[in-house]
Amino acid sequence: LLAGTLFETRRTAVKAMTCAGFFKTAERARVSIRNTKAGNFLPPGTNALIAFDFVNHGRSAAFLEGARFTPYVAKFLPEVPPLSDRAGAFQWVLSAGETKGYLEPLGLTEEQFKAWQVEKANIFVLGCVIYRDVFGQKHQEDFAVMFMPRGGENGMDTFRPVMMREYWRSRSGSEVEAL
């Protein structure tokens, strides 16, 4: 009788832990970017403003801790895109369903400009946003955006952004990189 009761208690505990895990997954924050725009990266050394909207698609608040943005010029992205050590640290709360705009100044080096101009390489901005959910779990969303020149006037729409979905990835817990 005692063994049966212990077995039932253990099974009930396992079910409760499983339900709690599903609840955390369903209710947690999920942050991504959208509405990306870039100013003019030219001439080299000029800081273009990159505009991103951070969006919380989840069902609870996200506590944004920072982001990393890396300009990268090449014909193709490597399998594992490199992220710079340069990080923007900030403390924001992003409510469920909320969108918040962010501007980051990024520029091309002489070498990157030459690769773009001579080798017809592409301009990418690689990045990640790091945040915590209401359960205290740390998350990181990696992304890559390719900017194609439109020509014409200077301004926020000089380069057309193309989201590189195959480079987007989500990480949690110990997989999250330090800022």
Predicted region positions:
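Terminal connector regions
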Residues: T109-G151
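Acidic, serine/threonine- and proline-rich intrinsically disordered appendage/tail regions
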Residues: Q140-L179
